[in-house]
Amino acid sequence: REMMIARPDNLKHLIVYKHPDQNVPFWSQLTVDSDECALFFKDGVYQGWLPAGRHTLQTQNIPFLNNLVNKFTGGDVFIAEIYFVKTQPIRSIPFGGKLESMEDPILFEFVTPRLHGEFSMVIIDPVRFVIGYHGQAAGSNDNDVTVDWIKRLFFMSVKTVIGQMCAQTGRSLLNLGGMSAELSGRMVQSAPNLADIGVKILQIADFNINFS
């Protein structure tokens, strides 16, 4: 009754792929590609993870599986939500649009920054990512939903960092156009809202800020 569990070839591009079946027989073979890891959840609670490679799912060699055994089946089936998460960098994600209006700390007027460019990112905490994703973009085997969610948090992050920079430097928001290199440097250092979901920004390219 063993099962072969792996990410299907036609879904290799997805940042997160959730295995459709939660009932997993003992001795099933799990294959994790070199650019991803596999996370096990039960009722939305994280239980453990497996690195790249081929794994035989049995409790002797993977102790956390003990928490997933279904006693009602004579103990030969695990109940688990299995997520495959990309751990390699994801490059050249384009972004563009308006931030919410912000009050200029010098002029005391509301201005609306517009930004565009592209960023590269990597998931450094897959558990946080799946927990956040579970609440926001889950179940859709669709990268667009996942990427839109990441972009929303990217914009929130830029807004937070802009606010911090203007407060610290005493500069007007209208000076932001000349501060894009500094701003992208800070985002690479620490992007607040993205850090909450285990994402690190590696680079921002062609970063442009203007005002509508």
Which residues make up each language-model segment?
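N-terminal hydrophobic membrane-entry segments
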Residues: 1-212
